[in-house]
Amino acid sequence: MNGCVMLAWFVIFFAELFHRENGFKVSQRQCLWSAVTFVPAAYLSLLWLFEQGDWVLVLSVLLIVWGADISAYFCGRAWGKHRMAPAISPKKTFEGAIGAYVIVIVFFALTYVFCVQQNVFTNYLFDNAGFLWGVGVLAMLVALSIAGDLWESMLKRLVGIKDSSNLLPGHGGFFDRMDASLPVLPATAFIMLWIQLIVH
């Protein structure tokens, strides 16, 4: 179920994002649909991941999100020239996204080599799906984290606000810190479930 929700959300979001040649436009109904399905899916996935492992497993998944976010920001500032979605988030660039892919994959490849902790998600992924498949899955999760960030920016622009709340001054609000994890958590849960059912 999580995988179906994630896939449907991802397809609809990017279809809307790139279909419009004269600027981004999305309906309130589509935003509401994505919010009421994806936020609960992310929460349930978080609980399921805790049941499968412990805080190390969950933290390792969130490190993918945070690593992609930080890497995309600094790589975008250093080399960004081509904007990804200027109507939604003018500062996001394709160069930043590529930098995020490379840094996250290299970091977790090194983690796999030097860290023997089995509860780390990427170690579990590489051990059970193979290194090449693991790299492909990591690239997909980075793409989903960027999509989640863009989705939250889209919602804010739709309602005409800059920050989602005042809870974390200077960071755009609590939701701004968690937006990228919303699609990643269901995707991670789906991947682990697939490995358990198909690979094992």
Predicted regions and their residues:
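Juxtamembrane boundary at the C-terminal end of a transmembrane helix
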Residues: 113, 190-200
